Regions:
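Active-site-proximal loop/hinge segments that shape catalytic or ion-binding/gating pockets
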Residues: 13
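N-terminal signal peptide c-region/cleavage motif recognized by signal peptidases
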Residues: 16-17
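Sequence context surrounding c-type heme c attachment/ligation sites in exported
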Residues: 28-60, 64-150
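Bacterial N-terminal signal peptides that target proteins for export
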Residues: 1-8
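Cleavable N-terminal signal peptides
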Residues: 9-10, 20
Length: 150
């Protein structure tokens, strides 16, 4: 009887360890997903920054392409913020999961601002592009200030 209890106990322990490992892998994948999206978005956003600051010559088609890429990428990271992914190799604060409505509002605002940036880029008007860029950057910074570890 005692042997059966040990075997059953070991089986339960092994299955819970397997479930825990699967959850850890899911969490790791979520973190990798959002980090990759933010990294690529940052690359294109930096190119736009160089243009609006005059460190890179204005090239209308490239600005349009970069702005559209940022717009597309702005929709990708959010599915990587799954419960449990506040642990691990991440700069995300736990507040994201306690203030989900605020986080969702800022993520939606970023998507809106990047969409506007892409539209304004098509005008070719550098002054308007710079303003739209600054509004987008301010939205990024607001979210980082509240929800990103330093």
């Amino acid at each position: 009887m005692k042997l059966i209890q040990i075997i059953v106990g070991a089986s339960i322990l092994a299955s819970s360890a397997t479930l825990s490992f699967a959850q850890d892998r899911k969490t790791e994948q979520a973190i990798k997903h959002r980090r990759a999206a933010f990294t690529v978005m940052s690359t294109y956003f930096s190119r736009l920054l160089q243009t609006v600051e005059g460190d890179r010559p204005f090239n209308g088609p490239m600005v349009i392409s970069d702005a559209r890429t940022v717009e597309t990428l702005s929709r990708l990271p959010w599915e990587g913020f799954v419960p449990g992914s506040e642990r691990g190799d991440t700069k995300a604060k736990e507040d994201i999961w306690f203030e989900e409505e605020r986080f969702k509002k800022l993520s939606t605002e970023l998507e809106s601002k990047t969409s506007n940036l892409a539209k304004v880029a098509e005008t070719g008007d550098l002054k308007k592009i710079k303003l739209a860029f600054e509004q987008t950057r301010d939205t990024c910074n607001a979210c980082h200030k509240e929800f990103r570890k330093k």
